[in-house]
Amino acid sequence: MASSNFLVLLLFALFAIPQGLANYEKPPVYQPPVYKPPVEKPPVYKPPVEKPPVYKPPVEKPPVYKPPVYKPPVYKPPVVKPPVYKPPVYKPPVYKPPVYKPPVEKPPVYKPPVYKPPVVKPPVYKPPVYKPPVEKPPVYKPPVVKPPVYKPPVYKPPVVKPPVYKPPVYKPPVYKPPVEKPPVYKPPVYKPPVEKPPVYGPPHHP
């Protein structure tokens, strides 16, 4: 086996060395680049991978005791506002012409008389009912005397609760994507001009 490998290597060396020397003596031959069109591969369909839902047990937070915060009352001094003088505003009388309303004529409506026959109710006779008087003899109830009950004091030893170790709860950071709000278009609002009546001030005496 070793001799066969040695013979193969020897033959390869004898063939390769002269070929290499021949290639070294010849100048390099220019070969233009060959255009290879890109190979288009059809898309491979990959079915979606379904992941089973992961159950996360709810994290119980112990109630936190917050002592009440005492806020002292804040003294606010009374605010004194000086009287504001408002001159009388003269309003000229507004003349409204009388509105003519023609009289409305309603034709008379005829209502025939309604005949109601008289209703006869015969008298109902109720015989008198005799109720004899009920006599109840007096009932004697002797006074009830209850002796005092002695209750010895009950000793309750103090209850000692060992400290409970609560491991810290790890909360992973929650990623909140930025919220993009589209711009809201507000059409221009037309405001008609406001006409203010002239204000007449008090008359000035010379």
UniProtKB/Swiss-Prot annotation:
Sequence repeats lie at residues 32-36, 37-41, 42-46, 47-51, 52-56, 57-61, 62-66, 67-71, 72-76, 77-81, 82-86, 87-91, 92-96, 97-101, 102-106, 107-111, 112-116, 117-121, 122-126, 127-131, 132-136, 137-141, 142-146, 147-151, 152-156, 157-161, 162-166, 167-171, 172-176, 177-181, 182-186, 187-191, 192-196, 197-201. Keywords: Cell wall, Developmental protein, Repeat, Secreted, Signal. Expressed in hypocotyls, roots and mature root nodules. GO terms for cellular component: extracellular region. Residues 32-201 are annotated as: 34 X 5 AA approximate tandem repeats of P-P-V-[EVY]-K. One of its GO terms (molecular function) is structural constituent of cell wall. Pfam families: Extensin_1. Residues 51-84, 132-206 are annotated as: Disordered. Its main location: secreted. It is found in: Secreted, Cell wall. Residues 1-22 form the signal peptide. PANTHER family: PROLINE-RICH EXTENSIN-LIKE PROTEIN EPR1 (PTHR34629), REPETITIVE PROLINE-RICH CELL WALL PROTEIN 3 (PTHR34629:SF4). This is a developmentally regulated putative cell wall protein. Belongs to the plant proline-rich protein superfamily. ENOD12 family. This is Repetitive proline-rich cell wall protein 1. It comes from Medicago truncatula.
